[in-house]
Structure formats: structure tokens, C-alpha cells
Amino acid sequence: MKVVILAGGYGTRISEESKFKPKPMIEIGGMPILWHIMKEYSYYGFNDFVICAGYKQHMIKEWFADYFLHTSDVTFDFTQGNKMIVHDQHAEPWRVAVVDTGLNTMTGGRIKRVQKYIGNETFMMTYGDGVCDVNIAELVKFHKQHGKLATLTAVVQEQQKGVLDIGQDNTVQAFREKSINDGAIINAGYMVLEPEVFDTISGDDTIFEQTPLRELAAKGQLMSYVHRGFWQCMDTEREKSMLEKMWASGRAPWEVWNQQ
């Protein structure tokens, strides 16, 4: 199953760093937050990624092209014609398609633009600026069991956008843009989607969190997988610093691939 990651945003609220690189390439513990997200999916056996790039998309492509240089010790032997020797080579079991989905394309438009890379298959989608410790295997199992077109991961947060009204059977009954209460249940990404969802997206200007998700909710085709564990997006410098401190502590909740 392919994993689509939205990685085309500007990240304008995160310090000077976001002026020079795409938001998903902003680093936590020396590695882009995009890498952290991919590591979690990979831990659960999902290694086929489609990155919806946009702003400074060349930086994402160059980072993957030079991945060995980021993760291995190397020797450059100029006496042998600029030969490079990679030591203790570490290769992720990943297949990564980095797709330029446009500079100002909305979230739905970016998903629509990578349809040809997905085909007629169930796929996953998440945002390139949020990490969590959701059990992705259980998320996929839940999606397959209910048989609806879409599942999103829902978490409890204070005063956020994308607020959900959820029924007793976990059906999303309404999708609102603004919270009116603290402790609201919100959309955290980490979605599982059927290919029919592409039909709800009209073009580049479609915001996926508006018309498509609202239509799916109205038709009873949007389910929520309620996650009671850790989730955090990286929208501000304060949130970035908080994630950095968690990583430096050696006990980052989302680092499931290293937990015993």
C-alpha cells in the first residue's frame, strides 16, 4: 500500500529556517521531520512513498539523492579519480517518488495530481508536518473492517481547526473548520483512502479538508480512528522546540522504530 505525504507547504510560521527550505525538510534531531514520518510508516511495513512536493521541491529530491551521504560514513579518494567509498552502508527499504505538484496547489489538488502513481488501489495519506505514535497496522485493519471510503486519525487537541463530530460507531457526522470548545476532536491526518476519493477532488484549487471530506462525511463514508496516544504537528517555533527537546531526551514518543 502506497503512502502519500503532503510536502508542498511553505511553513511560514516556523522561524527563518522555513524561508530557505520546505516545511517537511525542517529538521528534528538533525533529520527532516519528513524522515521521522517515513520511519514510522516503515516500522509497520509500509515502504512505498509518494511525496507531494511543491515549494523548493528540488531540495527534497536532492536530499533523497544524497541519502547515503546523510546516513553513512564515506571516504573520498581523489587519487582514484574522485572515487567515493561508502562505509557501513545503511539503506532504508524505501521506494520514494518525489512529485512536483505545483507551488500554490491546494491539498486536494496535490492528492489529485499523484493519482497516476496510486492507480486503482487503497492508499494512505498524511501531512508532512506532524508526528505521532499511532499503530498504523491497527489503523489499516480498522479501515478494511468498516468498508467505507475514507478513514482519518482523530485526536483530542485544544482550540484547533478541522474539528470533528463523531457518532457512537466512529462515523464522522460533521467536519467543521473552527473549534468552539477546548478538548475538541480534530483531524490528525494519517488517513486510509479508497481510490474513489479521487472523484471528490475537482482540481488544483480543492482543499481536501473542506469539500471532499465534508461530502464524504455527509454520505456516511468517512470514519474516524480515534487515537489516544501522542500526536503533534509542527506549525510554530515553539512546537519545533518542543519536538527537538523530546528527541534529545531519547524518549521521543513517535520513535516507535527504536522502542523496545
Located regions from the model:
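A structural signal for short hydrophobic beta-strand segments in well-ordered beta-sheet cores
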Residues: 25, 164-166, 213, 224
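Catalytic-core segments of class I nucleotidyltransferases/pyrophosphorylases
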Residues: 122-124, 131, 135-144, 156-159, ...
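Structural beta-sheet core signal
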Residues: 3-5, 51, 125, 150-153, ...
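Conserved beta-loop-beta/alpha segment of the NTase-like Rossmann-fold superfamily
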Residues: 60-168
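N-terminal glycine-rich phosphate-binding loop and ensuing alpha1 helix
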Residues: 1-67, 98
